């Protein structure tokens, strides 16, 4: 090869330097001067023989060669012609060719030549006059489209101030009444107890009613102006004759910009005070989108640089075999794709976790408020202690060692009285211990003094066992039950299910 290999960046720099396409674009301060024209590099499946690549590299730059003129035959002639030829109807595009070396492999890159903007200055000068006529036509058409807004008002609320825009009438700044009490939320209603200001009025003929608005005798270019910014065009109307400004002594004025927005209804986007008593309002409207002159700029054309592998005749067989292998691997991978959608690492609908025999989801039970299920875990009746077996405890997911520890604690607190250890399930599950009271104590509870004694006993029990959600269960921590909230029963200290018994603690699981 006679030309030195270049990297991808060199191709892009060369393509940009050889093109004057940016000259067609109007200047915008937000544009990237090095971003136009735009290129992308593509590596299609295919190759070109070394002898044929040499012929492209040795020819004159910026030419449009025909592969049929090359006498040497290649095995994949159709593929090469499809890549090198331009896809346009009957016309051959101009290309330059460069050799690229990437990861030890040589490529022949075809760079499209973008037409230079300075090649036909006469045509550009002629188009300037046509452009002026087009701008005048677009201005007239824009005013015609906006005329549909006559008799309608738009509103905009910004903090204390609200604004009304009534086309062909005026723009007003006022304070709105708070909504409620018969005052609608929209449109905002003016509070006549505060000052309001007219920011600008549309020009009207003499003697015409100000509230109805009318067309002025001025030309369309005096009423409106078509401006271009960033490739998009919008209509501008400058309104004067507003209320007098206290600071400057001049009348207020406002500039209104109408922008095409096909996804929006007529609305005020924002309004700001550029300087004292001079304002700028931007309005989005789909009406202007009916004229192509106001449509948003289209996406810039991206030119494709195609790079194909350069092979010797001896390397063609190996390349074809590798290409066929890659195609077969793609077919295998597509066949192995999961039939069900995978979300969060779980194949939805595969029934790997539930849905088959032995993997059923237990139906939930809707428990109403106050509905509880009580099962006896252990109890002491007439001095005899009865406990559930280890297998039965496992059904309730209870630890045998913990139950034994709670049993000893109940024995200590009961002081020889009968007691019951229950597991209560409902909206959650917890253990509850109940100590039976003596008959004499039951009789004592009926009088006033007994109520006082029982209340004191209940308070002492709370100090010992603690309340739910409160830290510091000293006895509970010593017995290995730290972290399980404790509380008392109802205020009278009686269990509705067990007559003559007193609840000692409640241990949530």
Curated annotation (Swiss-Prot):
Motif Prevents secretion from ER, residue range(s) on this chain: 506-509
Primary location class: endoplasmic reticulum
PROSITE patterns: ER_TARGET (PS00014), MRH (PS51914)
Region (Disordered): 64-91, 433-509
Signal sequence residues: 1-23
Glycosylation site residues: 120
Basic and acidic residues composition-biased segments: 75-91, 452-461
Gene3D superfamilies xrefs: Mannose-6-phosphate receptor binding domain (2.70.130.10)
Subcellular location: Endoplasmic reticulum membrane
Biased composition regions of type Acidic residues, renumbered to the chain: 436-451, 489-502
GO MF term set: carbohydrate binding
Reported function: Lectin involved in the quality control of the secretory pathway. As a member of the endoplasmic reticulum-associated degradation lumenal (ERAD-L) surveillance system, targets misfolded endoplasmic reticulum lumenal glycoproteins for degradation.
Name the record gives this protein: Protein OS-9 homolog
Encoding gene per record: yos9
